[in-house]
Structures are given as structure tokens and as C-alpha cells.
Amino acid sequence: GIPVCGETCTLGTCYTAGCSCSWPVCTRN
């Protein structure tokens, strides 16, 4: 839930390991 992945996922995909898409940004925990 913390937006620390430094990645956006406007297309719905995160490439950073351990991160999930909480549109429009990737989050971890």
C-alpha cells in the first residue's frame, strides 16, 4: 500500500518485483 515503487501502471502492469498496481501507480504493502 505504500507508493514507493517509483513506477506508474497506467497500462495495468508493474515490472518492479514485489509491487502491485494500484492505478495509476505501483505500490508495495
UniProtKB/Swiss-Prot annotation:
Disulfide pairings: 5-19, 9-21, 14-26
Residues in cross-link Cyclopeptide (Gly-Asn): 1-29
InterPro entries on file: Cyclotide, Cyclotide_moebius_CS, Cyclotide_sf
Domain note: The presence of a 'disulfide through disulfide knot' structurally defines this protein as a knottin.
Record function comment: Probably participates in a plant defense mechanism.
Family listed: Belongs to the cyclotide family. Moebius subfamily.
Entry protein name: Cyclotide vinc-A
Organism: Viola inconspicua
Origin organism lineage: Eukaryota, Viridiplantae, Streptophyta, Embryophyta, Tracheophyta
